[in-house]
Curated annotation (Swiss-Prot):
Alphabetical keyword list: Ribonucleoprotein, Ribosomal protein, RNA-binding, rRNA-binding
Role according to the record: One of the primary rRNA binding proteins, it binds specifically to the 5'-end of 16S ribosomal RNA.
Subunit structure: Part of the 30S ribosomal subunit.
PANTHER family referenced in this protein's UniProt entry, alphabetically: 40S RIBOSOMAL PROTEIN S11 FAMILY MEMBER, SMALL RIBOSOMAL SUBUNIT PROTEIN US17M
Protein name: Small ribosomal subunit protein uS17
GO biological process, one term: translation
Similarity remark: Belongs to the universal ribosomal protein uS17 family.
SUPFAM superfamilies: Nucleic acid-binding proteins
GO annotations of cellular component type: cytosolic small ribosomal subunit
Single annotated GO MF: structural constituent of ribosome
Domain of life of the source: Bacteria
């Protein structure tokens, strides 16, 4: 791990796992409106690499920034923090 810079980590919910070894993770952030000072919930979707296809929809995951793996994929799933119940 030496020689690498500090990598960003994000936490979010899996919203899609239809692709092979790829999941779509929605990351929610709270920001203040510049004029009205109201707290707004912003959501951004990231494509993340899931090597074992272990993630299910609704799982809470931690992902880390990595080298570009495809046109849109620059994140990889590090761990599954919370599992959803299987129906």
């Amino acid at each position: 791990m030496e020689g690498r810079g500090i990598r960003k980590t994000l936490t979010g919910r899996v919203v899609s796992n239809k692709m092979d070894k790829t999941v779509v993770v929605a990351v929610e952030t709270l920001v203040r409106h510049p004029l009205y000072q109201r707290t707004i919930r912003r959501t951004k979707k990231f494509k993340a690499h899931d090597e074992e296809n272990a993630c299910r929809i609704g799982d809470k995951v931690k992902m880390m920034e990595t080298r570009p793996l495809s046109k849109e994929k620059r994140w990889r799933v590090v761990e599954i923090l919370e599992r959803t119940k299987q129906i």
